[in-house]
Amino acid sequence: MNSPANSSAARPAAGPKSVAAFQRASALMPGGVNSPARAFGAVGGTPLFIERAEGPYLYDIDGNRYIDYIGSWGPMILGHAHPEVINAITQAAAKGTSYGAPTEAESRLAEQIIEAVPSIEKVRLVNSGTEATMSALRVARGATGRKKVIKFAGNYHGHVDSLLVAAGSAAATLGAPDSPGVTPGAAEDTLVLSYNDVSGLQNAFAQHGDDIAALILEPVVGNMGCVLPTMEFLNAARDLTTKHGSILIFDEVMTGFRVAYGGAQERFGVTPDMTTLGKIVGGGMPLGAYGGRADIMNQVLPAGKVFQAGTLSGNPVAVAAGSATLRLLKENPPYEQLERLADRLADGLDRAATSAGMAHTVAKAGAMLTLFFNPEPVDCWAVADRCDREAFGRYFWGLIDEGIYMPCSQFEALFFSQQHTEAMIDETIAAAEKVLKSL
């Protein structure tokens, strides 16, 4: 759904103001951005610079409006600038933006998280999902006295040195799964396995079980596209970690409060020992959390000896946004609505791609979805890596010209908000059909 300024078929993919803004930013910041995927490296061209967002829409500085399927890469499940969240932020900021001291609001948010997430008995607030996963690994190693960690190719757990190995997200998109600056020593205790490979998991525990501190995974992968686990795989992860005394960590930074109020662990009925959270839990503000069994979390200083701290941890403005968001999700759960929208879009994209003769598959979980330019069902990174990246890039820019803003990478799931409607879904399907037929 385009604004009048967006209706001209002759306009370039990125408007002149975005082009100028990117040139300026590139002289000031590495690559012109503060997070790699935003540079549009996977699709080419100039990134769009955003002026504002409201409900399900983004507005760029050239005056174009887009139906937004990024949602700030996941947090905006209520839609952009929800009035009650903005009010909570405004009221909190008016009292002071940071105290460096405890507040009752932190306890209220902690209670909301503990009530919602099955695995969490105690929780620690931090500033990002990356910080949450980094801290959870340290706690797991401290609690077990072991060193080795299992992760899965294509799973992204933030820019943590020991986990930036065969990572998804921008690392996969840009062809740099192993970053310069990450020393061999930082990753030597990380075992990388194939997602959904039960036999590989069994073999790893047979060989290293007594040395494995933790197994960390995305219970629905969102950083090599939307990839679902098999129940056999999740149950094997749970059973093997229990048998060998290792800690099972679900990275629910993306899935937490999105695929169900209690996250993927509620959706699938598999309870980990620890959980990491981000995105929705902060209501669009910089906030993350990690938590789990009380005996594990009591290892964290000052209750225990594992050090973790942060100047802005429990920031009152971020806590207010997160608490308001979780309250609204509990009072008026959007999950059935989001499932219906996902079904509608998945079916429509499947029909459009089939009609266009495009080799594809569609995968979804709750309010997460990916159209893969690959005829094989994607269940691991080896299959995801065979997607047609060039076709995806043309598809992305075609949709931009139709006023639809999808993630700028084949390997990022798209997200819905409570503000999306069936009419918007139908408009998106019609745009996709037009673009796919032109590829």
Swiss-Prot record:
Gene Ontology, cellular component aspect: cytoplasm
Transmembrane residue ranges: none
Cofactor list: pyridoxal 5'-phosphate
Coiled-coil annotated spans: none
Subcellular localization: Cytoplasm
A GO biological-process term: protoporphyrinogen IX biosynthetic process
GO MF: glutamate-1-semialdehyde 2,1-aminomutase activity; pyridoxal phosphate binding; transaminase activity
Cross-referenced Pfam families: Aminotran_3 (PF00202)
Major localisation: cytoplasm
Gene3D superfamilies with a match to the protein in the record: Aspartate Aminotransferase, domain 1 (3.90.1150.10), Type I PLP-dependent aspartate aminotransferase-like (Major domain) (3.40.640.10)
Protein name, UniProt field: Glutamate-1-semialdehyde 2,1-aminomutase
